[in-house]
């Protein structure tokens, strides 16, 4: 995420500036994708939407090591911090968990784009701090759109569904060892 940020961040910030100006002027918000859109729907609970991984582990994992780390990561995930999972499970250098880590944000962003395009979720007009908890972040960033908050909840649920098969594979991998 951070590697490509130098390329896409200026574009997203310009789109956000246009949204912010339109919101202040009381005109139609022009851009769906902007910096807060990515924060709200692509990096919820941290890069890779790892809050979905925490939920999947707590429900489906039989690995005590994964469950212990997931329990420690819950308060961090609430504030979009996922380093305990990235380095504790680890996700780094773990092909089983790296795959959903890359897929979940893309699927979530595509879903959120659709929900915004059809008018269910409001467009982003406020750049809430990245540590703002999920649901509240979407609500604030969209200028009070309940649809954006609901969309963010659905995006986390989608991430859980994406992570489940990989958590089950990790269970089987431990059994094989």
Where are each of the predicted segments found?
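Pore-lining transmembrane helices
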Residues: 1-174
């Amino acid at each position: 995420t951070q590697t490509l940020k130098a390329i896409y961040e200026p574009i997203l910030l310009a789109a956000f500036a246009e949204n912010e100006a339109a919101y202040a002027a009381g005109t139609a918000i022009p851009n769906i994708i902007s910096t807060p859109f990515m924060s709200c729907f692509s990096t919820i609970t941290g890069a890779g939407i790892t809050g979905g991984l925490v939920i999947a582990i707590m429900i489906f994992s039989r690995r005590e090591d994964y469950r212990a780390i997931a329990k420690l990561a819950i308060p961090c995930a609430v504030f979009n911090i996922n380093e305990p999972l990235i380095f504790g499970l680890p996700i780094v250098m773990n092909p089983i968990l790296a795959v959903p880590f890359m897929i979940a944000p893309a699927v979530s962003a595509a879903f959120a784009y659709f929900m915004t395009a059809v008018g269910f979720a409001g467009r982003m007009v406020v750049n809430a701090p990245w540590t703002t908890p999920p649901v509240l972040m979407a609500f604030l960033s969209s200028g009070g759109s309940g649809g954006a908050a609901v969309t963010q909840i659905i995006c986390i649920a989608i991430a859980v569904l994406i992570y489940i098969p990989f958590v089950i594979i990790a269970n089987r991998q431990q059994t094989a060892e």
